[in-house]
Amino acid sequence: MSSWIRWHGPAMARLWGFCWLVVGFWRAAFACPTSCKCSASRIWCSDPSPGIVAFPRLEPNSVDPENITEIFIANQKRLEIINEDDVEAYVGLRNLTIVDSGLKFVAHKAFLKNSNLQHINFTRNKLTSLSRKHFRHLDLSELILVGNPFTCSCDIMWIKTLQEAKSSPDTQDLYCLNESSKNIPLANLQIPNCGLPSANLAAPNLTVEEGKSITLSCSVAGDPVPNMYWDVGNLVSKHMNETSHTQGSLRITNISSDDSGKQISCVAENLVGEDQDSVNLTVHFAPTITFLESPTSDHHWCIPFTVKGNPKPALQWFYNGAILNESKYICTKIHVTNHTEYHGCLQLDNPTHMNNGDYTLIAKNEYGKDEKQISAHFMGWPGIDDGANPNYPDVIYEDYGTAANDIGDTTNRSNEIPSTDVTDKTGREHLSVYAVVVIASVVGFCLLVMLFLLKLARHSKFGMKGPASVISNDDDSASPLHHISNGSNTPSSSEGGPDAVIIGMTKIPVIENPQYFGITNSQLKPDTFVQHIKRHNIVLKRELGEGAFGKVFLAECYNLCPEQDKILVAVKTLKDASDNARKDFHREAELLTNLQHEHIVKFYGVCVEGDPLIMVFEYMKHGDLNKFLRAHGPDAVLMAEGNPPTELTQSQMLHIAQQIAAGMVYLASQHFVHRDLATRNCLVGENLLVKIGDFGMSRDVYSTDYYRVGGHTMLPIRWMPPESIMYRKFTTESDVWSLGVVLWEIFTYGKQPWYQLSNNEVIECITQGRVLQRPRTCPQEVYELMLGCWQREPHMRKNIKGIHTLLQNLAKASPVYLDILG
C-alpha cells in the first residue's frame, strides 16, 4: 500500500509522460520503412541490410509527407526504379539524394508535383540514360550525376549543354560509354544531327487597340526535329493556334486591355534542349476609373483612386464643378504604377470645412475619357452640428479661390449663398464673438498651465517624473516575445531622460519596442509541445555575448538529433528568475516552437532543470549579417587581419535579400510583426544561408542603432516608418518599411542608415518624407523596390509576397557562387 502511495502525484505524471514518449518513438519508427530513419522533415535510408527495394513511402496517419523537405538514400543496391507516383506525396521536397545505389530508371513524370525541388544528387548509380523532360519544369540549382554509366547518345546531349551553360569551376566530370564500350568525357561528345533547336517569331507591330485582332507567325528548326508550342501565360483574350512540325500561327481575337504588357512566346523543344522567341503585347484603350472612395486620414487626407488606361491618361480634378488648381497643399500623387494601372490619391494637407464638397476626377487620353465624383466631408462647419447641411440658406460664407486655398476658379462665385434674414445674421455674429472670446480664454488658460509645468520641469533632474515615464502596456499590437519585467531589463532610471524624443512641442508617445515578434495567447497553437532538454546534455564551450536578458553561449548538445551524436548550438540563459520572467520564458518558448521555417533560426527547446533557465537555438557559423556584410565589403581591409575576405557580389547580395524576404513572408502568413528587422538581427550560416533571429544581444552590441526614450524605451528609429515613430503603430506594413532599409544595408555592405545624421535629425528626415539614397552597388530595380517599401502611406507600400517574388526573380537571373565562405 505504501509503495502505491509513493507513485501518486508528480512521480506518476512523469511515468505517464515517459510512456507516451516511448509510444511516440514507437509510432514514428513503425511508420518508417525498414532500413530507414524518419523525422518530421527528413527521411534517410543508409543501412544496406536488409535494404529497400522501392522508393520509401510513409505509412498513413504517420508523419505528414508534405512536411518532408529532404530524402537521403545511400547503399541501396536493390533500389532500381523511381515510379511516377513514388515522389508525388512529398510536395515540399527540396533535396533528393540517391547515391551508391542501383538506380537505373526514372519515370518521365516522377517529379511532376515536386516544384520545390532544388537539389538532386544521383551520384554513382546505374543510369544509362536520363531525359531532360524529368527536370524542365523544375528550378534546380544543383543536379549531380557523377559516376553513372551513361550511353553516348543524343538523349544525354542536354546534360553536356547544361554543363557548358554553367561554365563554373565546379563542373562535373561526366563520362559515357560509346559503341566500343570506351569511356569518353561527356564534354568531348559529338553526336551528328543532334543540336539545340531555334525559334523565330515573325512579329508584326504588337501595339494594338482594345477589341481588335492580331495573328502571330512562328517557325522552328533543328535536328532532331523540334516540337513547337505557344506559351501565352495567363492570356485573357480568346486565342487559337495552328501548328505543324516547323510552322505555326497564333490568332488572338477581341483583345482585352487586361492583356497589355503580357509576354507571348514561341517555343521549340527537342531532346537536346529548347529555344524560344518572345514579344510583348501592348494594348491601347480608353481610360476607366475603377476605384474612387471617400477621403481617408493618415498623415495627410487622401481621396484614393485607381485609373486604368493606355496611353497614360491625363488626370484633372474638379471641385464643386470648377477646375481645381493644384498646389503643394492639394495635389495628385501616384503611388503605384502597374503598367496600365495607376494607384494614387488626391492629397490634401490639413483640409478644413472650407474643403468640404464634391470632387470629380476626369481621366482622358486619345481613345476616350471617364469621370467619377465623390462627396468629401473633412470637418464640421462653425456654428453648425457636424452632421448638419452646410448649404443651409441662413448660413453666410465667402467663396474661396485659388489665392486662399488653391481650389477652384477665382472668378467663380457660384459657391456664395446670400443671406435671407438680416436679424439672424446679426445674432450669429454676436454668437461668433462669444465663441471667439471663450476659445481665447481656454487657450490662454492652457498656456498658463503649460508654462507652470515647464517651470516645474526645470527643477527636476530629468525633466519628467513618475507615471509619465512608465511604459504603456496597452499597445495596439501584442505583448513582446522577449521578457520585460517591470522595466528591469535596462539599468537606467525609470525617469525620462533629457534625450527623450521631442518633435515640435510634443513628446512622442512610444512604448518598449521588443526585439522580436508580438504575439497573443490566442495565436499559440493549443497543442504546442516544447521540447525539454536535459542539462547534462548541454556542454558550454564559450561565451558569445550578453544581452539584457542574460548571457549567450556556444555549446555542444548531445542526443538532440538522431543522425548526430552531438551538434553545436547557441544557448540563451535567463538571468532574472522572477515568476513573471519564468512565465514570459515559457510563453516565448511556445511561440518559438510554433515558428518553423528554413529562414527563421531553428529553436530546439528549453532546459528548466535548476537555474538559470536555458533556451537552445541552432548555431549559425558566421554570426550576425551586419558583421558579415562589413567583413565582406570594400572596407574589410581596414578591419581584417591578414588577407581580407572576398568582397560580396551583387548576385550574392540578392541571394541574401530574397532569403530574408522569404522569412518575412512566413512571419506575415503567421500574423506576426517583427518590429525590429535589421541585418544585426539576421544570422549567417554555411553556404550563405541567412535566417531571421536574434538572442537579445543586439541592443548591447549595436547600442548606437537604438535611441533611448524616457529611460526605458529603446527604438530602432533608423529602421522605422513615420507611423511607428509618431504613433507607435507596428504592422506588417511597418515591417515592409524595415525590409526596405535592410535591403539598403545589404547593398551598402552593412552601413548604418542615415549614418551622417543624429537621431533627432533622422526623425525629422523620416517624418518629413525623405528617403535613403540609392547605394552605389544597388541595381535600379532593387532601389525601386526600396522606394516601394518606403511609401509614406502604409497601404501604398509593396506587398511582402510581391517583394519576395521580385527578389527571387532577380536572384535567379544572377547565378550565385557560394565559395565566399570558404
From Swiss-Prot:
<dbReference type="GO" id="GO:0022011">
    <property type="term" value="P:myelination in peripheral nervous system"/>
</dbReference>
<dbReference type="GO" id="GO:0005769">
    <property type="term" value="C:early endosome"/>
</dbReference>
<keyword id="KW-0675">Receptor</keyword>
<dbReference type="GO" id="GO:0031901">
    <property type="term" value="C:early endosome membrane"/>
</dbReference>
<dbReference type="GO" id="GO:0046777">
    <property type="term" value="P:protein autophosphorylation"/>
</dbReference>
<feature type="active site" description="Proton acceptor">
    <location>
        <position position="676"/>
    </location>
</feature>
<dbReference type="InterPro" id="IPR031635">
    <property type="entry name" value="NTRK_LRRCT"/>
</dbReference>
<keyword id="KW-0812">Transmembrane</keyword>
<dbReference type="GO" id="GO:0031547">
    <property type="term" value="P:brain-derived neurotrophic factor receptor signaling pathway"/>
</dbReference>
<keyword id="KW-1133">Transmembrane helix</keyword>
<keyword id="KW-0550">Obesity</keyword>
<dbReference type="InterPro" id="IPR020777">
    <property type="entry name" value="NTRK"/>
</dbReference>
<feature type="binding site">
    <location>
        <position position="572"/>
    </location>
    <ligand>
        <name>ATP</name>
    </ligand>
</feature>
<keyword id="KW-1015">Disulfide bond</keyword>
<dbReference type="Pfam" id="PF13855">
    <property type="entry name" value="LRR_8"/>
</dbReference>
<comment type="subunit">
    <text>Exists in a dynamic equilibrium between monomeric (low affinity) and dimeric (high affinity) structures. Interacts (phosphorylated upon activation by BDNF) with SHC1; mediates SHC1 phosphorylation and activation. Interacts (phosphorylated upon activation by BDNF) with PLCG1 and/or PLCG2; mediates PLCG1 phosphorylation and activation. Interacts with SH2B1 and SH2B2. Interacts with NGFR; may regulate the ligand specificity of the receptor. Interacts with SORCS2; this interaction is important for normal targeting to post-synaptic densities in response to high-frequency stimulation.</text>
</comment>
<dbReference type="InterPro" id="IPR001245">
    <property type="entry name" value="Ser-Thr/Tyr_kinase_cat_dom"/>
</dbReference>
<dbReference type="InterPro" id="IPR002011">
    <property type="entry name" value="Tyr_kinase_rcpt_2_CS"/>
</dbReference>
<dbReference type="GO" id="GO:1902430">
    <property type="term" value="P:negative regulation of amyloid-beta formation"/>
</dbReference>
<dbReference type="GO" id="GO:0048403">
    <property type="term" value="F:brain-derived neurotrophic factor binding"/>
</dbReference>
<dbReference type="Pfam" id="PF07714">
    <property type="entry name" value="PK_Tyr_Ser-Thr"/>
</dbReference>
<feature type="glycosylation site" description="N-linked (GlcNAc...) asparagine">
    <location>
        <position position="241"/>
    </location>
</feature>
<keyword id="KW-0966">Cell projection</keyword>
<feature type="modified residue" description="Phosphotyrosine; by autocatalysis">
    <location>
        <position position="702"/>
    </location>
</feature>
<feature type="domain" description="Ig-like C2-type 1">
    <location>
        <begin position="197"/>
        <end position="282"/>
    </location>
</feature>
<feature type="binding site">
    <location>
        <begin position="544"/>
        <end position="552"/>
    </location>
    <ligand>
        <name>ATP</name>
    </ligand>
</feature>
<dbReference type="GO" id="GO:0030425">
    <property type="term" value="C:dendrite"/>
</dbReference>
<feature type="region of interest" description="Disordered">
    <location>
        <begin position="475"/>
        <end position="498"/>
    </location>
</feature>
<feature type="site" description="Interaction with SH2D1A">
    <location>
        <position position="706"/>
    </location>
</feature>
<dbReference type="GO" id="GO:0005829">
    <property type="term" value="C:cytosol"/>
</dbReference>
<dbReference type="GO" id="GO:0051965">
    <property type="term" value="P:positive regulation of synapse assembly"/>
</dbReference>
<dbReference type="GO" id="GO:1990416">
    <property type="term" value="P:cellular response to brain-derived neurotrophic factor stimulus"/>
</dbReference>
<dbReference type="GO" id="GO:0043235">
    <property type="term" value="C:receptor complex"/>
</dbReference>
<dbReference type="GO" id="GO:0001764">
    <property type="term" value="P:neuron migration"/>
</dbReference>
<dbReference type="InterPro" id="IPR000719">
    <property type="entry name" value="Prot_kinase_dom"/>
</dbReference>
<feature type="site" description="Interaction with PLCG1">
    <location>
        <position position="817"/>
    </location>
</feature>
<feature type="glycosylation site" description="N-linked (GlcNAc...) asparagine">
    <location>
        <position position="121"/>
    </location>
</feature>
<dbReference type="Pfam" id="PF01462">
    <property type="entry name" value="LRRNT"/>
</dbReference>
<dbReference type="GO" id="GO:0043121">
    <property type="term" value="F:neurotrophin binding"/>
</dbReference>
<keyword id="KW-0832">Ubl conjugation</keyword>
<dbReference type="GO" id="GO:0071230">
    <property type="term" value="P:cellular response to amino acid stimulus"/>
</dbReference>
<keyword id="KW-0547">Nucleotide-binding</keyword>
